[in-house]
Amino acid sequence: MKILKNEYIRQSFITGLVVFALYLGITHTFHPFIVSGNSMQPTYHSGQIVTTITTYTQSDIKTGSVVIFKNNGKKLIKRVVGVPGDTLVIIDGTLYINGEKDDSEFAAIDVAGTLSNELTLKNNEYFVMGDNREADNSRDSRTFGAVSYEQIIGIVDKTIGER
């Protein structure tokens, strides 16, 4: 009888550990985020729900990654256009990265905002912009400057639905 009781306790403990590990894995690896506003159109629109990967290293954040970050207490979603070491400038509505004209998917949109002086990103800084880059459509690094690695909450993984 004592052997059965000890086996039951051992199995319960193992089951509890597995459940706890799954809980931690799910809640600390993936996090849902509801897109608000039109700054990321046409890629994402208001009301879409995206999942973010919240366990990542600095090398996982690349040019083109879409990230969720905190700025003045608000969570925002933007695309990374500049990574540590990059030099950026906006001249006549065109974004230049490391002296090269931005040729990304959203480069055809005239870039509003100012970055008339070259900005070289420090070791933990990222330059982020909304995909909807016309005037007043995106509050991003053109407005509030570079985003630090510590401000980034997660990297967008996929869209899972609508609110």
For each predicted feature, which ranges?
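Beta-strand-rich cores of mature extracytoplasmic or soluble domains
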Residues: 115-163
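Structural motif
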Residues: 48, 62-65, 86, 125, ...
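Short, surface-exposed secondary-structure boundary micro-motifs
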Residues: 55, 72, 93, 131-132
